Amino acid sequence: MASLLNIRGLSVSFGGVPVVRGLDLRLEKGRTTCLVGESGSGKSMTAFSIMRLVPEPGRIEAEAMLFDGDDLLKLPEKAMRSRRGRDISMIFQEPMTSLNPVLRIGHQIAEPLELHQSLSRKEALEKAVELMALVGIPDAAKRVNDWPHQFSGGMRQRVMIAMALACSPRLLLADEPTTALDITIQGQILRLLSRLARERDMAVLLITHDLGVVAEAADDVAVMYAGELVEQAPAVEFFARPLHPYSQGLMACAPLLGNHGAHRLPSIPGMVPLPSELPEGCAFGPRCPHFEERCRQPQLLRETAPGHSVRCWKV
């Protein structure tokens, strides 16, 4: 299957300090890839680099970042700006801070339609109503004139999805889209994203730290730690046989996934290292129960089974 997005050797740094290191990632049409890891692992910065929205003084470097054959890092800024929202769209973490509190919901959904599709305000608002209905907002024709504060957290997140889908993007980046939502609404949003990915033949990169979200939504899983990809596999294979010690630790810490009964959940000791204080060799080494001397040497991401790669000497 041809990749919609093919990233090779992506690195992001600030003042010479790397926050993403040599990342390779392929995203396929109609599939949802979950990028999982603790806070500080480089997940969000990976998404921002795809959008070319890494804040200054951040520096993006890569062998290639091919989107449908075009290298995004070589596009002029004007050409990249036209890609954002039209071909590549993003759902941000906090819908209340991402929505403009002094603009009606309909106008915010209509804006990318007016910009990228040259629709009139009337036509764009009519399309906004259709999009609101598509993402499950009831009474869309009435609510299109409401303000952001009149929507619940779950409904605001649906508005953000409607905005992201307005121009029918081929790639959707979703950065922790369900973090602030209760478990019922979270499930609804995840099922909605998965359904839209299939129906629209759209590639989705879903960023999360929650393996429950991964189990609900993922076709493929990519695990990041300290700026590196440490494991990548189809979701079914990943949950059946996680190989990297970090992946195994995350699984053991997840309720209902690797732990049963009334016992206290285990935790992974220590913290993700600061980008400026990375250890030699395996970045997970200081927290790993299987650490040995050779783990101080650099390790490559190796394929251990079709589609399943891991960065660990022990595998």
Stretches found by the model and what they are:
Residues 109, 161, 185, 189:
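Hydrophobic anchor residue at the start of the ABC signature
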Residues 38, 173, 177, 181-263:
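P-loop NTP-binding/switch modules centered on Walker-like glycine-rich loops
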Residues 5, 20-22, 83:
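Conserved structural motif at the start of ABC-family nucleotide-binding domains
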Residues 71, 123-142, 248-252:
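Conserved ABC ATPase "signature" region
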Residues 234-315:
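Charged, flexible cofactor/metal-binding loops and thiol motifs
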